[in-house]
Amino acid sequence: MRLNKMINNPLLTVKNLNKFFNEQQVLHDISFSLQRGEILFLLGSSGCGKTTLLRAIAGFEQPSNGEIWLKERLIFGENFNLPTQQRHLGYVVQEGVLFPHLNVYRNIAYGLGNGKGKNSEEKTRIEQIMQLTGIFELADRFPHQLSGGQQQRVALARALAPNPELILLDEPFSALDEHLRQQIRQEMLQALRQSGASAIFVTHDRDESLRYADKIAIIQQGKILQIDTPRTLYWSPNHLETAKFMGESIVLPANLLDENTAQCQLGNIPIKNKSISQNQGRILLRPEQFSLFKTSENPTALFNGQIKQIEFKGKITSIQIEINGYAIWIENVISPDLSIGDNLPVYLHRKGLFYS
């Protein structure tokens, strides 16, 4: 995250936002803030409320109650709902939605309000945005002459044209094939960073959010479970459900021996939680915490294991090891000379997380 983001006044503030469709509540007391230049990913499964939240910020959906502030300006509150066109936000959806009768240049010019882009100031701005998004050579093409990735870049350029401080993107890469998705995603994120705009992405792709977000908001059933940096959500989540959602995990019943140690089927595991209410619960570990090699002078714990399966995958070898009757998979980049049935030490790196 860039240093210029760390300022006192957030760009966007959402306070106690609720939304009902008839009698069904789809947003539950949503509150968060977004700093200038920050990129936030709303992460959750289909139907969790993330798109509804994005549309509420844009003004396409009217919340039932709560407040939305853009800088120090109220854009939604009690008896007040600022129209979408007056919020000065950019919005990009899954498949770009370009005007088929306008070429790329005119589509971007439409983002400036008149669809012409004829005066020198507008021309300069459009050319800057086309350079930024890597579509300068496509200026005279029409949407049907563009690939899916090119259409998404044009849609982003159109959203950036009026120089909004906040861009909202609703799963903009989901309609692209995997190879193209990786390329376009990286290019669009780079363009957003260079523009200085803040952005909120809706996604169900965990790896995408871990890789590109400054912060991630985990949304389940219309509620934000936790909002934090990708590293914090992965290694120090507040809730077990968040931990499991953020990546592959090993979860075992456990008992506290003291405030720093829990006992589970694997053995005694050092833990790092400091606020624990009960002595019985579950411990969470990530598979990558286990290694057949001593990668630090003081590993967190040491176990005796036996190899049960070996799967060679080229540069990676997956090894299933049983520790005290519990089997875990370890991936090794370096493939040592090992055989099924071998007994060997297994090292644990980093502490576990205990949830009561």
Curated annotation (Swiss-Prot):
Gene Ontology biological-process entries: transmembrane transport
Protein name as it appears in the record: Fe(3+) ions import ATP-binding protein FbpC 2
Catalyses which reaction(s): Fe(3+)(out) + ATP + H2O = Fe(3+)(in) + ADP + phosphate + H(+)
PANTHER family: PUTRESCINE TRANSPORT ATP-BINDING PROTEIN POTG, SPERMIDINE/PUTRESCINE IMPORT ATP-BINDING PROTEIN POTA
Entry keyword annotation includes ATP-binding: yes
Residues covered by the ABC transporter domain: 12-246
One example GO MF annotation: ATP hydrolysis activity
Keywords for this protein: ATP-binding, Cell inner membrane, Cell membrane, Ion transport, Iron, Iron transport, Membrane, Nucleotide-binding, Translocase, Transport
Gene3D superfamilies found in the cross-reference section: 2.40.50.450, P-loop containing nucleotide triphosphate hydrolases
Role this protein plays: Part of the ABC transporter complex FbpABC involved in Fe(3+) ions import. Responsible for energy coupling to the transport system.
Name of the top EC class for this enzyme: translocase
